[in-house]
Amino acid sequence: MSAPSSAPALIPRRGMMLVLSSPSGAGKTTISRALLAEEDGLEMSVSVTTRAPRPGERDGEHYHFIDVARYMALTKDDGLLEHARVFENYYGTPRAPVEAALARGCDVLFDIDWQGTQQVAEKARTDLVSIFILPPSVGELERRLKGRAQDSDAVVAARMAKAMDEISHYFEYDYIIVNDDLDRSIADVRAILRAERLKRARRIGLAEFVNRMRGAGE
C-alpha cells in the first residue's frame, strides 16, 4: 500500500482520482507504469470482475474476482464508482477502497475509458482529475498497433475505428497530452499530478495550519 505523498507534509490533504484514458496504442499503459514506479502516494485502482482468473492473475492484485450475485449487490448499493458489461462478464471499480485511500491522502490511478470516466465524474467530480492521451497522428497510432505484431489486420482496423470514437471525447477531459515523446509525456503527467496536489480545495488541513500560524504570530 502506498504511503501518502509528503508534498507538503505539514498540511494534510485529500487524495485525488487520477484518470488516464487513451485509445489502444497511445501509450497509456506505459505512462501508468512509470507513474506507479516513480510517484510516492499513488496506487492503482483494482477493479472487480465476474470473469474467471486467467493464468498468472492473483485476486486482489490484478482484479477482485467476485460472483455475479456480489456484483449485482454492489451495483444496487451504489458500491461501484463505474461499471460496465464486456461481452458476458461484468467489471467495475469498488467505491470503498478508493474512498479509504483518498481519505488518508493517497491518490488513486484509474485506467478506464471515456464511459467509465463519465460515470466517475457524475459521482465524485471534485475528487477527479482526468487526462486524455492522444497519439501524435493517426498514422503513428496505426504504426504502433501494427508494431505489436500480435493482432491481425482485421483486429488493427477494428482498434483504429474504436480509437476514432474514443478520441472524439477528448473535450470531456481536464488535460490533453499528445504522446509524441514518451519521457516528456511522463514528465507532463507528473507535473499535473504535483500541481493538483497543491490545490487549495484538496488541502483539508490548510485552514488549521494557517490559524496556528496566525496564532503564533500574535
Swiss-Prot record:
This is Guanylate kinase. Belongs to the guanylate kinase family. It is an enzyme of class 2 (transferase). Keywords: ATP-binding, Cytoplasm, Kinase, Nucleotide-binding, Transferase. ATP binds at S22, P23, S24, G25, A26, G27, K28, T29. Its EC number is 2.7.4.8. It comes from Rhodospirillum rubrum (strain ATCC 11170 / ATH 1.1.1 / DSM 467 / LMG 4362 / NCIMB 8255 / S1). Residues 15-194 form the Guanylate kinase-like domain. SMART domains: GuKc. NCBIfam families: guanyl_kin. GO terms for cellular component: cytosol. It catalyses: GMP + ATP = GDP + ADP. It comes from the Bacteria. Essential for recycling GMP and indirectly, cGMP. It is found in: Cytoplasm. GO terms for molecular function: ATP binding; guanylate kinase activity.
